[in-house]
Amino acid sequence: MAATNQPMIQLKDVSKIYDNGTVGLKDINLNIDKGEFVVVVGLSGAGKSTLLRSINRLQDVSKGDILIDGKSITSAKGKDLREIRRDIGMIFQSFNLVKRSSVLRNVLTGRVAYYPTWKTTFNLFTKEDKQKAYEALQRVDLADKVYTRADQLSGGQQQRVAIARVLTQNPKIILADEPTASLDPQTSRRVMHDLKMLNEEYGMTVVANLHSVELAKEFGDRVIGVRAGQIVYDGKMSETSQAVFDDIYNGGNGKKGEEDA
């Protein structure tokens, strides 16, 4: 029987090297517990997106093992892999909505993993799941847009539809890859508030890549700094100074804004 205090996400000596030799991740060892709200910060190209995409196995790692609630997603196949992924919700910078479909239909895709393909192809969702989708839209204040086409919404509204889709999926984990990168400051804070709501009210573990240090400070409970594919800082947000953020981004060399190779 698995220990009750096992990490929700565990990376053991994980590395990712791309075909062209670029190092995406190098010797990552990381535990994230159930219910944490973790923000990952670092320069563009530091490895933040590679980290999240590896956790959900959107890309395979070159070395090491990744466990989701005690189960290896690295070695999982077929039904086992699908069941693990069902517990992981993804939120992307580009929203990943079907633009010509209604808001409701987009939110219902959060339930796809619970159905055989032929049922979702013909939109044969149960009344219970349609109710779940509607209630999720209520939580993000978009119930009045239920039959609106996704491409008629603003960027902020589209991202909130993506959050409602994740809520309908009811995962244990949410991975948010730069969820506010294309949004204005006010809308960004609203999206982060919605993610915090999923974390606090539903107990979902959230790992979010953020380019905004201010948003990271406001919403994160724990901060992980990534530079050149390695974790260079891991600590409580309440104990993390501005000097630490400066070091994560500048590498202690004083060259602010320097891009990764």
From Swiss-Prot:
Superkingdom: Bacteria
Domain ABC transporter intervals: 9-253
UniProt catalytic activity: phosphonate(out) + ATP + H2O = phosphonate(in) + ADP + phosphate + H(+)
InterPro entries named in the record: AAA+_ATPase (IPR003593), ABC_transporter-like_ATP-bd (IPR003439), ABC_transporter-like_CS (IPR017871), ABC_transpr_PhnC (IPR012693), MetN_ABC_transporter-like (IPR050086), P-loop_NTPase (IPR027417)
Binding site for ATP: 42-49
First-tier enzyme category under EC: translocase
Keywords assigned by UniProt, alphabetized: ATP-binding, Cell membrane, Membrane, Nucleotide-binding, Phosphonate transport, Translocase, Transport
EC id: 7.3.2.2
GO molecular function list: ABC-type phosphonate transporter activity; ATP binding; ATP hydrolysis activity
Compartments where found: Cell membrane
Membrane topology of this protein: Peripheral membrane protein
GO cellular component labels: plasma membrane
Keyword Cell membrane: yes
Residues passing through the membrane, by range: none
Main localization category: membrane
Subunit structure: The complex is composed of two ATP-binding proteins (PhnC), two transmembrane proteins (PhnE) and a solute-binding protein (PhnD).
Task performed by this protein: Part of the ABC transporter complex PhnCDE involved in phosphonates import. Responsible for energy coupling to the transport system.
Similarity comment text for this entry: Belongs to the ABC transporter superfamily. Phosphonates importer (TC 3.A.1.9.1) family.
Protein name: Phosphonates import ATP-binding protein PhnC
Name of the gene encoding the protein in the UniProt record: phnC
